[in-house]
Amino acid sequence: VPEDNYLNKISTPKVADAVAKNDMKAAWLAELADLNVCSQKGLVEMFDGSIGAGSVYMPFGGKYQLTETQSMVAKLPVAHGKCDTVTMMAYGFDPYLASWSPYHGAIYAVLESLSRIVTAGGDYKKIRFTFQEYFRRMNEDPKRWSQPFAALLGAYNAQIGFGLPSIGGKDSMSGTFNDIDVPPTLVSFAVDVAKEQDIITPELKAAGNELLYFTIDKDEYDVPVYAQVMKLYDAVHALIQKGAIVSAYALDGKGLAAALAKMAFGNKLGVTVDTDVTTDTLFAPGFGNIVAEVPAGKTAEVYEALHNAGLSANVKRAGAVNEEAAFICGDMKLAIDEALNAWTGTLEKVFPTRATEDKEEVKTDLYHADSVYVCKHKVARPTVFIPVFPGTNCEYDSAKAFERAGADTIVKVFKNLNAEDIRESVDEFTKAIDQAQIIMFPGGFSAGDEPEGSAKFFATAFRNAKMTEAVMKLLNERDGLALGICNG
């Protein structure tokens, strides 16, 4: 392994300078403000995380929605009944590590994606991977072929080590523009299945809880000792299921400080770091390592579980959750709001999270009704018609919501493969509207939001004379209701 080992050094220059000057506060603030650590909430919120009822947790957690999650978890969509089976997905990749060593970059991409599933409560043994590869353009220079070879060798090493396959993927070797090359890229996506009740989220839950740090072993070539990693992750998974671990975070190319801060932001709880935690642990890469929040009465259970697995040397106390809303590390006391300003400030002007600085309260008098209007056409169970167009995606959720409330639903797909299909669909839709008391337009991307904007397909179809007449009769003659969500 070369002397300038990326895995053993503090990679952010400003952080390294602050550590060299023994300025812990400056080091924490520089780490949180770093482009690879800072908040991307403004960018994330451009993509709607609230559509659909299947999501188990939001992209940001905690009372203040500031702890970023490391994976996505969603229930399987079923037409009837309840489902507690969830799918999980997480990714891993560090371009700086891959640039230093494509071989290690691929190994730790696989490990990082796997560890993020584990910290959310997933069982790593059920994981399957898919790899996205992107390399510089290959030419007659044989040295250029070394990068994809080394990266794929690393990914293969990790698959054999964990006994888990990659069952799909995509590659491109066109990442060159003039004399600019992309870093050797192998992004690992880990996909898993689990039960909803086993899922945990990464934000800190309560003051007084202890923070334990689990570490992986590496061999002399800085490759993970897979047998030890699997034993450790088995133990962590079992402890999560028993409720001994209530939140956890998988470390990446940054150290423990960034992980603890991100866990703390969601509920604005502080952290007191133990004095024996080194600056390397706080700021150097920690791929595969996990920090976990453990209720005070459960720490003995955790230590015992690790001891029984022969892993006593791989767990130590890193600190505790405090009530002071501050990060305390030796002589340093950093207020959580100051840390938050550093973390959110880097990209706030690029991807703003606040629409305006105007704090004027907006009055919403929309729902203030002096009298309740009662429908003149009474039915025991109202029927709701839900029209489905190619691209809509919340008809299941909408139908379930109405059925839970006591309504009957008619869900029909608008078929548009040929003219005959369209004519049949118009007749079916008209018949369904005539039977309904409510029409509910679901959300999604009808016709991919083409041409030029959302719901054009909806609007075009419902301009058909038969359907227009049926809707007008529903609203004006039968005292019916129409509503929609998103595209609808």
Positions of PLM-derived features:
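Glycine/proline-enriched, intrinsically flexible loops and inter-domain linkers
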Residues: 1-438, 442-447, 461-472
